[in-house]
Regions:
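A short secondary-structure junction motif
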Residues: 57-67
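Acidic two-metal-ion nuclease catalytic site recognized across multiple nuclease folds
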Residues: 111-113, 129-146
């Protein structure tokens, strides 16, 4: 239900993430997209910037909607309200700290470091795509160092 979700998305948060109230209200509910999300995240790797936060948030939202973590032998299928979060979970913030000669590891700083546009920074889709790009750039940088 959208009403439940709206309690967790303030106007300020929507603005930071570049959503309008209309876009938020027109978007599908978590219940509608949960089966597809569960299917996509059960096989790793999962790459994120401070990925532990993202994983905890996903677990929290799944639980709020009555999903349970699947046991090792349970299948994640549409309608069974189970989820698994895949491995490995790769944290680009930690990789930047370990491998890059930068003082800061936040995503915007890494965008600047790798000449990635800041135009839509904080929009969920852009952040996800840029995080993937940062991951590849860190791996490329590290392979050239060796």
């Amino acid at each position: 239900p959208k009403k439940l979700e709206m309690e967790f998305a303030s106007e300020e948060a929507l603005k930071v993430c570049m959503y309008s109230s209309k876009e938020w209200n027109d978007a599908p509910s978590f219940e509608e997209v949960a089966p597809e999300i569960a299917k996509r995240i059960m096989w790793g790797p999962i790459v994120g910037h401070n990925v532990q936060f993202d994983v905890r948030h996903l677990e929290s939202v799944f639980k709020r909607y009555g999903y349970k973590a699947a046991n090792r032998n349970e299948r994640v299928e549409k309608g069974n309200k189970r989820y698994k979060i895949g491995y490995p979970q790769i944290d680009t913030c930690a990789l930047a700290y370990l491998f890059l000669p930068t003082e800061k590891q936040n995503l915007n700083h890494l965008r600047e470091h790798f000449n990635i546009s800041l135009e839509r920074a904080h929009a969920a889709d852009t952040d996800a795509e840029d995080c993937r790009t940062v991951f590849y750039k860190i791996m490329e940088y590290n392979s050239q160092k060796s």
